[in-house]
UniProtKB/Swiss-Prot annotation:
Belongs to the glycosyltransferase 37 family. Pfam families: XG_FTase (PF03254). It is found in: Golgi apparatus. It comes from Arabidopsis thaliana. PANTHER family: FUCOSYLTRANSFERASE 10-RELATED (PTHR31889:SF45), FUCOSYLTRANSFERASE 2-RELATED (PTHR31889). Pathway: Protein modification; protein glycosylation. Signal peptide: none annotated. GO terms for molecular function: fucosyltransferase activity; galactoside 2-alpha-L-fucosyltransferase activity. The gene is FUT10. Its main location: Golgi. This is Putative fucosyltransferase 10. Keywords: Cell wall biogenesis/degradation, Glycoprotein, Glycosyltransferase, Golgi apparatus, Transferase.
């Protein structure tokens, strides 16, 4: 028994950081050998992925599904698969390095208004990076869905670190916006904001919209300080004008997908794309987001070392909002209260209950936080007292950087690796409002337990709630609907678009459970 305690003690007290763990490792482009007998039958996920890629160039695209102990129960619709293949062909015809793209950018540079809507089949929407990695991923998925619905080409601003994190998602072309794109220089000189003269919301407020004179581009402003006029871009009447504009430039930090369902034209297509409404991000993320080989090496090595032998895996993601941030006892108490109340972790016993007839189960807890104290304290709790179930509890935290360092390559790579590791757990607890958490549980097809935001530095009661949907929350949606639904609470227009559990009076979320 003493030997067992010593071994467990030695395992639990080590919290490995990615920087120390992986700097000692050489990137192995082949990863571990996988026996043919262990390969899943459907590495293309029901046709969600195309086979038109070289596997070695991006190991995670197909190999990441070997790590799942069971396949996702959510399969893409045939219509979604068909639309993705159609989009890939359109992107190949209109993407960077094509004649169509060159002609479109030349027209954009001339900055001439159009008298008609005839601009060919190639129209574009440019995504500008903003805020942390979680925000960037949920907005990329949102903008890509909008591109599918409107038959536009998504181009991604790569002045940040997108290409260091993610592989190209479309075969035979690129989604990266060329650095000589004429409007990029403008962003450095002035910046895109509500005061930008071709901001759609500003043009509406200034009565500057003329249906017979089409601007060469519009800027869509959809961040936390957006006005109601900015949020009208998804409405049917507004889309009839916006659809004629060849170039859209969008800056957003929000998952605006729920609002797209409020447009009847979009809704007709969305219902066919996603019969299971809570699967939007789950499918789009598995299609779009494939970590680079460097990031995937981090994921596979950490998983093999610490998670692969567990009987059960629990992910806990802790984000402390506001100032000061850091380790707080009331947050630690909240995590323990939630996990024990929901039977995710066992209670503590004063004396050990050893069942010699069968070996104890191993439950591994993966903690993602900027602060190491949460995993250290959780470790110490189970070292000090045995679990009521007799399970062995091991706690691991891949990194603890204390400060968010957005746009630092190594920091963002670790963050992406941890999102994927969390998505590979069996159950997950995440902080409410956290886009890092949204990406992790939705990517894994998991319905999370959401930790309520503490008020006045006290532990909430109840500490958490089980979400009925695995979709992210749209934090700053329009407060009302469009046209006929103007003035109606946007969370009460459709039975499947309702307020979020972690933002009861503001956010919107998609649900299948009516």
């Amino acid at each position: 028994m003493k030997i067992l305690i010593a071994v467990v003690f030695g395992c639990l007290l080590i919290i490995l950081s990615f920087s120390k763990y992986f700097n000692d490792q050489l990137l192995d482009a082949t990863t571990k050998d996988i026996k043919e007998s262990e390969r899943p039958v459907d590495k293309l996920i029901g046709g969600l992925l195309t086979a038109d890629f070289d596997e070695g160039s991006c190991l995670s695209r197909y190999h990441k599904y070997f790590l799942y102990r069971k396949p996702s129960p959510y399969m893409p619709s045939e219509y979604l698969v068909s639309e993705l293949r159609s989009y890939e062909m359109l992107h190949k015809r209109c993407g960077p390095d094509t004649k169509a793209y060159k002609e479109a950018t030349e027209k954009l540079s001339r900055d001439e208004y159009y008298a008609s809507e005839s601009n060919g089949e190639c129209r574009y929407i440019v995504w500008l990076a903003r805020d942390g990695l979680g925000n960037r991923l949920i907005t990329l998925a949102s903008v890509f869905l909008y591109a599918i619905l409107t038959e536009r080409i998504i181009l991604v601003d790569n002045r940040k670190d997108v290409s260091d994190l993610l592989c190209e998602p479309f075969p035979g072309t690129s989604w990266l916006l060329p650095l000589d794109f004429p409007m990029l220089n403008y962003t450095y000189a002035y910046g895109y904001n509500k005061e930008y003269p071709r901001c759609y919301g500003t043009m509406l407020e200034n009565h500057a919209i003329n249906s017979t004179s089409i601007p060469p581009h519009l800027y869509l402003h959809n961040i936390h300080d957006s006005r109601d006029s900015d949020k009208l871009f998804f409405c049917q009447k507004d889309q009839s004008f916006i659809d004629k504009v060849p170039w859209l430039i969008i800056q957003t930090n929000a998952y605006f997908v729920p609002s797209l369902w409020l447009n009847p034209t979009f809704q007709t297509k969305l219902v066919k794309l996603f019969p299971q409404k809570e699967t939007v991000f789950h499918h789009l993320a598995r299609y779009l987001f494939h970590p680079t080989n460097e990031v995937w090496d981090m994921v596979t090595k950490y998983y093999d070392a610490h998670l692969s032998n567990a009987d059960e895996r629990l992910g806990i993601q802790i984000r402390v909002f506001g100032k000061p941030s850091g380790y707080f006892k009331h947050v630690m108490d909240q995590v323990v209260a939630c996990t024990q109340r929901e039977k995710l972790l066992p209670e503590f016993e004063e004396e050990s209950k050893v069942n010699i007839s069968k070996p104890p189960k191993l439950k591994v807890v993966l903690v993602a936080s900027l602060y190491p104290e949460y995993s250290v304290n959780l470790t110490n709790m189970f070292l000090a007292r045995p679990s009521s179930t007799g399970e062995i509890i091991e706690v691991y935290q891949p990194s603890a950087e204390r400060v968010q360092q957005t746009d630092k390559k190594s920091h963002d790579q670790k963050a992406l690796a941890e999102m994927y590791l969390l998505s590979l757990t069996d159950n997950i607890v995440t902080s409410g409002w956290s886009t890092f958490g949204y990406v992790s549980y939705s990517l894994g097809g998991l319905k999370p337990w959401l930790l309520y935001q503490p008020v006045n530095f006290t532990t909430p009661n109840p500490p958490c709630v089980r979400s009925k949907s695995m979709e992210p929350c749209y934090h700053t949606p329009p407060s009302h609907g469009c046209e006929a639904d103007w003035g109606t609470n946007s969370g009460k227009i459709l039975p499947f678009v309702r307020h979020c559990e972690d933002m009861m009076y503001g956010g919107l979320k998609l649900y299948d459970d009516f």
